[in-house]
């Protein structure tokens, strides 16, 4: 049986932090390496670090628009809130979801805009 990298990562993800720490120590001992990050010597301060692409987004409801009932239904579907909480959030505006992937944020935005809401993804 051949282990793929994906299977190995999945197996590690199921372990506790203590088990992962023991695994790292065993790998260090077995291969004679260290998990410590190497120290980089900077040639100049002008060398800019690469810009990291944003991976987590926040979806914010700015305005409900004219179709308030449709927006409340969409907010309930997206957030899992009860009717009163969804109505309050729709009327006041605010953060619907935090720390979501770009794909999920775009999906939520499309659903709410289709219902008539104004949505912002940050």
UniProtKB/Swiss-Prot annotation:
One of its GO terms (molecular function) is structural constituent of ribosome. The keyword Ribonucleoprotein applies. SUPFAM superfamilies: ClpS-like, Ribosomal protein L7/12, oligomerisation (N-terminal) domain. The keyword Ribosomal protein applies. GO terms for cellular component: cytosolic large ribosomal subunit. InterPro entries: Ribosomal_bL12, Ribosomal_bL12_C, Ribosomal_bL12_C/ClpS-like, Ribosomal_bL12_oligo, Ribosomal_bL12_oligo_N_sf. It comes from the Bacteria. GO terms for biological process: translation. Keywords: Ribonucleoprotein, Ribosomal protein. HAMAP family: Ribosomal_bL12. Homodimer. Part of the ribosomal stalk of the 50S ribosomal subunit. Forms a multimeric L10(L12)X complex, where L10 forms an elongated spine to which 2 to 4 L12 dimers bind in a sequential fashion. Binds GTP-bound translation factors. Forms part of the ribosomal stalk which helps the ribosome interact with GTP-bound translation factors. Is thus essential for accurate translation. Belongs to the bacterial ribosomal protein bL12 family. This is Large ribosomal subunit protein bL12. The gene is rplL.
